[in-house]
Amino acid sequence: MRHANGLAAAAGVLIIAGAPAIAAPLNPKTVPDSARWVMHVDLEAGASTQIGRFLLDAIDEDSDGYKDIRQGLPGFTLAPEGGIHGMTIFGRSFGDDGPEQFVAYIDGDQRIGAWGDQIDAALRQAGQDSATIEVEGRRAWGIPIEDGDTTIFATLLAKGDARTWVISNDLLKVSQAAAFVEKGGGDGGALDGFEWRPGTVAMVGVKDPSEVADFDEMSAVIGQAKSIVARVGERDGVFFAEAKAVTEDPSGADQIARVLDGFVALGSMMQSNDPELARLMRFAHSLKISGDNGAVRVTFEHDAGEVLGLIKELKDEGEHDVELHFGHDDDEGDDD
């Protein structure tokens, strides 16, 4: 059963992580124009940056979930050393428990191509039948996740040394997406027209957010946005984060920008009485906000080493808070 649980955990991670058919930058031809939300991550680019390498190592060290995943997929890691190069996930809507329907691509090398055999071996060891099925002439794997009501389906594409897993919670979509990857014809969906800046590690886009359930409130905040796009990365030792929202009301974009500027100014005034806020406001001078032609743009560029220092501080403080919390519980138990 431990191996079966590991496969379920692996399937759950794939839902969260997503993946790309072509190593970054994103190949828009692999994402249909019907995709209302898209997320793309270039793990190779991330591992080459100060911040990305730290976060990948931290996830590897701290994630208890990896212990279960590795029962089914030995050596699994999100770092490129595990064979994964990049990730893309997209869909049309979100429900309360996440994407209602999604397609994900995981791009990598021959190491991830071995996952199928590893899944079968783990199932046999757990006393279960092979998870393989056939759909429209393609070999696919069906893996039930822990809630028992959902099955994740996946098929493997190979071209030279490259491997791509096509994953979905809909069996038919797995076959359709695999054919789409092979033939192309997409435009990038919600990331259509958003250029891949050198050094980009991750991009996310939402098209018509008012029609994507979990983005309703966000859309109201930025003036009934028609689209939201953002990217983060690191280039030549500089961390950057950029976001753009195209609104329905061109005249309102400048007003929204002024409101955001006002929040930054308010933070500057309040920081003298709040050490935590003061620490964050050290970076405020690197934040630029503008509104023009119906678009609100927010950009942040700062020395990557200093940003990494802040991330490490916050991580250490979070671990310290957890230790204090559990230590307090233990003390209470000793008093009883």
Model-based region annotation:
Residues 1-10:
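Bacterial N-terminal signal peptides that target proteins for export
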Residues 9-18:
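Bacterial N-terminal signal peptides
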Residues 22-142, 147, 194-221, 258-283, ...:
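Structural boundary/hinge residues at secondary-structure and domain interfaces
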Residues 39, 143-182, 233-238, 288-306:
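A short, solvent-exposed beta-edge/loop patch
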Residues 45, 108, 234, 245-251, ...:
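Beta-strand elements of well-folded, non-transmembrane domains
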Residues 85-92, 150-158, 220, 226-234:
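Broad, structure-driven detector of short, well-ordered beta-strand segments within folded domains
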Residues 151-218, 222:
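A conserved glycine-rich beta-strand in the N-terminal activation segment of trypsin-fold
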Residues 221-291:
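Intrinsically disordered, low-complexity segments enriched in Gly and acidic/Ser/Thr residues
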